[in-house]
Structures are given as C-alpha cells and as structure tokens.
Amino acid sequence: QNWPHPPMPP
C-alpha cells in the first residue's frame, strides 16, 4: 500500500 509520504531528500 502506498500512503502519502514526505518528500525524499535528493
């Protein structure tokens, strides 16, 4: 399941 996750660092 894919839930809204915070943006990943570059």
From Swiss-Prot:
GO terms of biological process kind: regulation of blood pressure
Subcellular location, record wording: Secreted
GO terms for cellular component: extracellular region
Key words, A-Z: Hypotensive agent, Metalloenzyme inhibitor, Metalloprotease inhibitor, Protease inhibitor, Pyrrolidone carboxylic acid, Secreted, Toxin
Superkingdom of source: Eukaryota
Tissue specificity note: Expressed by the venom gland.
Pyrrolidone carboxylic acid: modified positions: Q1
Signal peptide range in chain numbering: none
GO molecular function, one term: peptidase inhibitor activity
Sequence similarity: Belongs to the bradykinin-potentiating peptide family.
Function, in words: This peptide evokes slight hypotension (-2 mmHg), when injected alone into rats. It has no bradykinin-potentiating effect, when 60 nmol of BPP-10d are coinjected with 0.5 ug of bradykinin into rats. It inhibits angiotensin converting enzyme (ACE) activity with a K(i)app of 9.12 uM.
Protein name according to UniProt: Bradykinin-potentiating peptide 10d
Organism from which the protein derives: Bothrops cotiara
